[in-house]
């Protein structure tokens, strides 16, 4: 493990560990948002050649990663389906993506990440409502926007919720250990 590894543009492993040691949850929340912004949101938002499939692929990474922080999982090996079920069961605007037979996980997440296609007749758009179930259409931009809000909300929650804070520290211990 390298203490000099950058976890985000402004935070190394060593700097993160110091923040955790002194319990600076506000600064850690800011670091968390910065990390997600740099790694997930900005690369697809700043691109001049946005494509809904790439945006949804990133959204799926965010869902699984964010849920792993909520649960304090060291990794999500053999648990991806459960991560999506649990995240989509949360009271968020993305709850509309939950449903029978794990359609979002199977037709969108697995379709895009494994086959570079949506399945089940689903269309991926960059405008319109987040979900149009009747037309079988998803707005990738709206999904990513909702996820950005969820990351901000999570960063606020870890400042006051003891269990989430413990889970966050557990997950970040694994992240730092992988550096």
Predicted regions and their residues:
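Short, contiguous, well-structured surface segments enriched in hydrophobic/aromatic residues
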Residues: 27-89
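Helix-adjacent hinge/juxtasegments
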Residues: 90-97
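Anionic, Ser/Thr-rich low-complexity intrinsically disordered regions
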Residues: 12, 71-74, 79, 97, ...
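Amphipathic, Lys/Arg-enriched alpha-helical patches that create a basic surface
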Residues: 126-179
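Histidine-centered, metal-coordinating catalytic motifs and their short helical/loop contexts
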Residues: 98-124
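Surface/interface-facing alpha-helical segments and adjacent flexible terminal/loop regions used
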Residues: 1-35, 42
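Alpha-helix capping at helix-to-loop junctions
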Residues: 68, 93, 114-118, 153, ...
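A structural signal for well-ordered alpha-helical segments within the folded catalytic domains
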Residues: 57-60, 64, 82, 103, ...
């Amino acid at each position: 493990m390298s203490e000099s590894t950058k976890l985000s543009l402004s935070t190394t492993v060593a700097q993160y560990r110091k923040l955790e040691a002194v319990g600076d949850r506000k600064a850690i929340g800011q670091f968390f948002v910065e990390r997600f912004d740099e790694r997930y949101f900005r690369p697809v938002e700043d691109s001049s050649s946005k494509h809904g499939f790439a945006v949804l692929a990133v959204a799926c990474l965010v869902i699984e990663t964010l849920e792993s922080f909520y649960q304090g999982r060291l990794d999500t090996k053999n648990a991806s389906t459960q991560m999506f079920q649990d995240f989509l069961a949360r009271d968020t605007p993305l709850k509309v993506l939950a449903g029978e037979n794990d359609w979002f996980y199977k037709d969108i997440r697995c379709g895009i990440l494994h086959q570079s296609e949506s399945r089940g007749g689903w269309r991926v758009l960059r405008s319109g409502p987040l979900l149009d179930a009747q037309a079988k259409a998803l707005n990738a931009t709206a999904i990513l926007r909702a996820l950005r809000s969820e990351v901000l909300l999570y960063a606020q929650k870890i400042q006051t919720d003891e269990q989430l804070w413990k889970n966050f520290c557990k997950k970040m211990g694994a992240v730092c250990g992988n550096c």
